[in-house]
Amino acid sequence: MSRIVFICLAAILTDALTWAQVNVEPNTALLNEGDRTELLCRYGRSINYCRIEIPGEQKVLNLSPEWSKTPGFTYFGAGLTAGQCGVSIERVKASNNGQVKCSLGVEGEELSGTIDLVVALRPQQPIIELLSRPNREGYFNEGTEFRARCSVRDGRPPANISWYIDNMPANKRTTPLEVMSSTNDNVELSTSVQEIQWHLSPEDSNRKLVCRSHHQTDRESVPPQEAAYIINVRYAPVHQPDAAVYGLYLEHTAIVNITIRASPQPKIEWTIDGAIVGQGRTDGRYSAYEPQYLGNDEYNVTLAIAGLTLEDTTKIYNLRASNELGLTDYQVRISSSSKPPSSSLDVAAIVGIVVAVAVLVLVVLLIVFARATGRWCFGGKSIKTPTNETSDTESADIKATSTATATTTMGGVGVSAEEEETVNEQESPQEQQQQQQKKAKRLPAFAAAILRRFNEKDSRKYKDNQESLNIVEGSVQEIPATNNAIDGNDNEPKAIVWQSTSPVWTFK
């Protein structure tokens, strides 16, 4: 009983709290100046009146769905009887930033709720401040720890900061974003600060460091604001692999060009067979030119060789480039032959290789199939006859000779031989079939099925050939003995022979 009473009291208390509570939508409204918005306060029962106070407005708005007395502000909601008190603001002003208060009259008392209205203000242009100082000429030396700070002032809400190098994410070490608040003419604004740092390398020279702010007020027509700084780095000539120059003509003046990177401009000297040729000088057939600036800290270095000989192509040309930060040695080889082809394969070559491999695999599969089934080149060289001949032509000759001899000398012995041959012929297809079955056991299921199909066809063909041969043997035995007599034309015995390869009668 006490449990039921407790549940009832809890339900009543919950209902009372629900009625006494004013729900708001949204809790916080983040808007740009000039935006339109709707703010709503709700109660669980019917209300008598709806009053709303908006920062920056001189009077309290008494709103109802039945009238609209203040331009730019109208009632919003399903009606007072539904317990809803809301306002629709046509254009939000910067002075409206703050807390919007709604007051609802309920059965002789007044309930209230608040909504945070944040009107965004675009921050000032970002500023990059260098924490690491360059030299008088604005250069940093290679290996220096570069540090910079980006500040985005007076934004509402605070702006976010991101770093880029040449329009790519910097991916350098940064400090957490720091937000500082300040008040100006009773308006609270925020300033965002972040630092970035890393050790400089030659690749960082002439690159653009960008600090970009991201804010609520950014639009397609109003892109994010940013600040930029060009980093200048001094470094010794950059090492690179040995160079090779191809396509030079013998007995002509050869021009050898090498591109190197350095900051500031390097001094050049060539060493050829122990002889040193400085920039802007000529020594015999060798002339070294002044480095030519190409941009982005790159310089073109040229050596001219008058009357190039075959011996010149066997030499190693040593180049030394130096500036105030260090020196670097390079080795250059030259050749009168054309540039060697690239070792990489093009698309056509790859396709050709794939097709060739596919064809090779297909041929191997066909050979394996033919060998397993005894087809094509792996089949028998002749069709076996009841007398076990090895070839069609030989069988015809042997048939003629054996027939003539058997009719004159063998007599009854020939009959027993024929019976023995008939038994051998009956056993032969069975043995062949067993051999084929043994082969089929070693094959996959699909190959075994194909093999059985071929065996059935071969068995039917063999039976037909056997019946035809039996008829031929019967005909030969019925030939009278007078056929063994000597003919007056050629004085040789005659025999009628059935050719197994072609179904015709021939005379021997």
From Swiss-Prot:
Chain ranges on the Cytoplasmic side, renumbered to this chain: 371-508
Any single Gene Ontology cellular-component annotation: smooth septate junction
Domain (Ig-like C2-type) ranges: 126-223, 236-310
SUPFAM superfamilies in UniProt: Immunoglobulin
Bilayer topology term: Single-pass type I membrane protein
Side of membrane Extracellular, spans: 21-346
Residues of this chain annotated as glycosylated in UniProt: 160, 257, 300
Cysteine disulfide partners in this protein: 150-211
Disordered as annotated region, ranges: 381-439
Alphabetically ordered keywords of this record: Cell adhesion, Developmental protein, Differentiation, Disulfide bond, Glycoprotein, Immunoglobulin domain, Membrane, Neurogenesis, Phosphoprotein, Pyrrolidone carboxylic acid, Repeat, Signal, Transmembrane, Transmembrane helix
Description of the deletion phenotype: RNAi-mediated knockdown in the neurons of adult males, significantly reduces survival to 57 percent. Adult survival begins to decrease from approximately day 14 post eclosion. Pan-neuronal or glutamatergic neuron-specific RNAi-mediated knockdown decreases adult climbing behavior. Glutamatergic neuron-specific RNAi-mediated knockdown also decreases activity throughout the day (during both light and dark cycles).
Domain Ig-like V-type stretches: 44-106
Positions of modified residues (Pyrrolidone carboxylic acid): 21
Organ and tissue specificity: Expressed on different subsets of axon bundles (fascicles) in insect embryos.
Residues annotated as transmembrane: 347-370
Signal peptide: 1-20
Keyword Transcription applies: no
Residues modified as Phosphoserine: 382, 459
Major place of residence: membrane
Composition bias type Low complexity, residue spans: 400-409, 425-437
Role of this protein: Mediates cell adhesion in a Ca(2+)-independent manner. It plays a role in axon outgrowth, guidance and fasciculation of the developing nervous system. Function in neurons is essential for adult survival, and is important for climbing behavior and activity.
Entry protein name: Fasciclin-3
Native source species: Drosophila melanogaster
Gene: Fas3
